[in-house]
Structure formats: C-alpha cells, structure tokens
C-alpha cells in the first residue's frame, strides 16, 4: 500500500500550500511517519508561524468533496496532455526533439536541443531537468489555458523551423 501522498497545492489553485498526507495514522508505522514528519517540518524551516492561514487554502479547495481541487487538477492534467500531444506531433516531424515519457499528470518532459531551450526560455519560464540529455520540465497548472499551450507549441514549431 501507500504510506504517504504528496500534494502540490500550487498546481490546483493554492498560493503557497503543499501537503504530505500519511494515509494510515492508526497503524504503528503511520504514527511513526506522522511524528517524524512533524519534526522534519520544523527542522527544515517549513513551519510558518501562521501555518493555519496557509492551510486554509487547502481546506477551501477540498470542501464539498474536493470538487474544486479535482476540477483544477483535472484541468492541469488535460493541459499537460494537450502539450504532450502537440510536442509528440512536432517530434515526428523534427528529429532534433523527442518526448520519451507520456504525460501522466501535469508535467511534460521533452528533450530539446540546447539552442532551442535557450530561445524558448526567452518567452516561457521553465528549467532544464537534465542538462546531459537536454530534457526540460514543462508544468501545467489550474490556470494554464489552451491558448498558453498552443502559444508554446507555435513558438516551439517556429524555433524548430529556424
């Protein structure tokens, strides 16, 4: 089974909230994990003095059966799928790029030539995931629009054409 779940709140609409969820705090293992995480949070400077205000964002997103959180996450994932499909189509026409992994959540990891990455970064904010291979990390979130995705794909296609 799963002991921990990590939740990135910024991808679903929170300003600055992340969560680690212990799935079974009734077990001795779950209790030990929860205790260790509480201590780790303090020692790694992740305990804000007014944490309840940060946490309130997650509480709001997960009210009413988590409808808002699920809708926002689903949207982010669908935008990543759109981005993945577009880059996959470009990769079929341009041997200089590839996309080795499917988009399974809200992230896409294509491999681009360094000069394309540098020029694309002049218009879009993302970073190099693996310098040795040229793999970049492109993230979609609750507020990524179809126009955002299509704009990046259009820019990338233009750069590939030269």
Report each predicted region and the residues it spans.
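Conserved C-terminal alpha-helix-loop-beta "cap" of PLP-dependent enzymes
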Residues: 81, 87-161
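Active-site C-terminal subdomain of aminotransferase-like
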Residues: 1-92, 98-107
């Amino acid at each position: 089974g799963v002991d921990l779940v990590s939740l990135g709140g910024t991808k679903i609409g929170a300003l600055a909230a992340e969560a680690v969820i212990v799935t079974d705090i009734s077990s001795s293992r779950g209790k030990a994990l929860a205790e260790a995480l509480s201590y780790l949070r303090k020692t790694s400077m992740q305990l804000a003095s007014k944490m309840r205000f940060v946490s309130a964002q997650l509480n709001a997103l997960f009210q009413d059966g988590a409808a808002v959180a699920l809708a926002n996450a689903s949207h982010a994932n669908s935008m990543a799928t759109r981005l993945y499909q577009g880059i996959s189509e470009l990769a079929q026409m341009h041997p200089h790029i590839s996309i080795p992994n499917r988009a399974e959540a809200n992230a896409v990891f294509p491999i681009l030539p360094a000069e394309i990455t540098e020029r694309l970064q002049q218009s879009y904010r993302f970073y190099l995931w693996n310098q040795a291979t040229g793999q970049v990390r492109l993230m979609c979130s609750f507020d990524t629009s179809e126009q955002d995705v299509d704009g990046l794909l259009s820019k990338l296609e233009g750069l590939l054409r030269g």
